[in-house]
Each structure stands twice: as C-alpha cells, then as structure tokens.
Amino acid sequence: MDTAPTWFTGQLLLALPGIGDPRFEHSVIAMISHDEDGAMGIGIADPIEGMTVGAVLDQLGIEHEAPLDQPVYLGGPVEPSRGFVLHSRDWGGEGAVLVADRWMVSSSHDILRAIGEGRGPSRWLVALGYAGWSPGQLEGEMVRHGWHVTPGSDALLFDTPPARRWQAAFAEAGVDARLLTTKGGEA
C-alpha cells in the first residue's frame, strides 16, 4: 500500500532529548515549509543574548517610537545574518507569505518599518537565520527520534516566554517533558 507523505508546514518541531546536535537542544522550530524538496523552519525558543528588536532597527536606520526590547531569536544555523519576522495574519505587506493558514512570515524591511511605526502585525517575533533540511533529511531525523511534531498554539508561539516554550509545547501535546530521557530501561 502506497501512503501519501506527511508534511509539517505550519506545525512545530520539538527537539527530543539526545537529538545529537547541541545547536538544537531544547529547540522549538516553527515550520515554514516542508515538502518533497526539503524543509525550512525558524527557531523560536533561543533568544540571542543582548540583541533586541530595537537594536536591530537602530542598526538598520529604521526609526521606532517604542523601545522594542523584545528579543531577537536564533532562527537556525543557516544564513544567520538573514532576518525573518514570524507574525499574525493581520498584516500582509510586501513579501508576506501565509504559512498553512496559521501565521505569516516576512523578510523585508517593510515589516520592520511597520513594526517601528506601530502599524505592523498585532503579534510577531523576529529571528535571524533558519533551520533547513534537504529532501528526505528531516524524515530521516524523525525516524531516528530526533524530533516530535505538534500543532502548537498561537499563544505558545507568541505569548509564552522563550525559556518555557519547549516544555510548554510538549505540555500542549500531552507530554511531560521532564519524563523524556535518552536512556532505555531494563525489564
């Protein structure tokens, strides 16, 4: 029997303990795209120490009224100087892409100007870099128990403090993350 592949666009990937790559320990990744050509996601649980949205806007010469002290997240190891804004669907400016009818992602300065001027989306987060997988790579990592997939909620994505996102995402999926282990028991 031939079964259709399962794609994870619009869902959250949660790193399982012992994933084998320290860059992804306790990662929560919002999946932007996943299909036969590979996958792309943005990490939403690892703030870059000392970097705020206001500081990024200052570096880009974009004026802003509010201090914008929200953290900038490490989106992943691929293209770490490339910025992304993951945001609610109530803003659809230049280059905004709808992700699985759930949220949107933008990477233009247009959205940063809108945020700086207070006319951007109602909910958003900014990340640098992304996580990328070649065709079949993510599926292989799933077989090796590297990731858990969950729908996640908008509240988890935008409202939960970053230090709690990994554990909270597992809790939303009905899993107590404290009980996860990399070691098997003996019967």
From Swiss-Prot:
Coiled coil: none annotated. SUPFAM superfamilies: VC0467-like. GO terms for cellular component: cytosol. InterPro entries: AlgH-like. PANTHER family: UNCHARACTERIZED PROTEIN YQGE (PTHR30327), UPF0301 PROTEIN YQGE (PTHR30327:SF1). HAMAP family: UPF0301 (MF_00758). Belongs to the UPF0301 (AlgH) family. This is UPF0301 protein Sala_0165. It comes from Sphingopyxis alaskensis (strain DSM 13593 / LMG 18877 / RB2256) (Sphingomonas alaskensis).
